[in-house]
Amino acid sequence: MRKSSLHTLVLYARYTDKLSYYDDWQYAFETHPDLCARSVNICDGKNLRSVKRSIGDYDLIVLLHSVNADTLVFIEPYRSILKDRKGKLLSFVGNEVNLPRISMKSKIDFIKDVSADFIGTQLPLEAGRWLYVECRGSSVVALPHALNPKAFGPIIPNGERTIDIGARSHQYWSCLGDNERNDLYGFFAKYPFIPSLKMDIDTKSRFDRSGWSVFLNQCRGTISNEAGSYYLERDDATVRKIQAFAESQQKEKGSKIVKPDSLPERLWRFVPSQLKEVVKAPLSRFLKSLNVSYYSDIYEQLDFNETFERFFKDIPRCPVYSKAISSRHFDAIGTKTCQIMLEGRYNEILKADEHFIALKHDFSNITEVMIRFLDSTCHQVMVDRAYEYIMDQHTYRHRVDAVRDLM
């Protein structure tokens, strides 16, 4: 079989337009010249029968991150179909952290049950192999995110950008045991920079892919850190304790909880993002008046220090390095937006003070960081160097090349 004849089925779940890398991976598979790819949205019920009829026709079946990142509800009807495949199965895994929304164990159990041939991890390879050690029939391969240069390119020259430092991220929940990103955003929002800088940092709103690209092109710089948590567990033991604690508190208050995958939550998934932004606040107030809490609000409101002291203080960190590079880092490089980032490993892809300006975790070198950031020559050299490096080795085309070579 020639590699150019790889018939590929790409399964994805389209119920959000906020995470741009979902579209970037899908586009990369669909446009790769060595694949004949068909993409199917598993959230559309009418596709189930078609996939069942044709599953034996594919050399490669790919489960993108979206099929298991937040729920297994949509992929569950495909479980028996995937077992009947003839081709190889590659399963990506979305959100490789322990969350009350969906357990890592349930994702691992699904992958084991369908006997995935390959597991594509966003984590460093050592961490991925540790996490999926029970999936003995699967090969764990490092497939971190990358750059889609068609979606994220340098449109506005750096000297013409109107925002000095801009950033977007949802607040990290306390149940991750990791407050680095929240602390980073809080520090930059409050620090008295001299000279003063124009900041646009927000943890309450997000962009779709095109909006995120436009925003980055307005920013000379952005701030970030590695994704994930130092407290990754295969059995979700700690987050289950936090979940039981949080639910017992709500019960004591006589409050009901809108839980994950309940009917109201399923309906909410399909509300357009712009409408969600409009109705979220009044809906939250209405639910509060009924003494009803949405599960995510409960975890957002948990105090980090109290949660850490109660649940994380006396447990060891993950035995392997479990934080990772994320799509946001590649998006910024694509738009030539200079990154100020906390020190970390970044999957050994990005090098400190070569591809980004490294900030110590206690922020003690902020003066030196800003001197480098405000030096226009240093700034331009860094973004150009990072851009050329990523374009040469770390686009989504390169990632799908690696998938093709597995066959």
PLM features per residue range, with description:
Residues R2-R136, A146-P154:
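Extended catalytic core of nucleotide-activated donor transferases of GT-like folds
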Residues K3-T16, S20-I42, S91, I111-K112, ...:
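Catalytic binding pocket for nucleotide-activated donors in carbohydrate/polymer assembly enzymes
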Residues S20, C175-F187:
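A conserved mid-protein helix/loop that constitutes part of the nucleotide-sugar donor-binding site
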Residues S66, H170-C175, K198-T203, F311-Y321:
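Surface-exposed cleft-lining segments at the edges of enzyme active sites
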Residues L147-R161, S210-G211:
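Acidic anion/phosphate-binding donor-loop and adjacent secondary structure
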Residues G159-L176, Q218:
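Conserved donor-binding/catalytic core segment of Leloir-type glycosyltransferases
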Residues M199-S205, S296-E300:
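Active-site donor-binding acidic/aromatic loop of nucleotide-activated sugar
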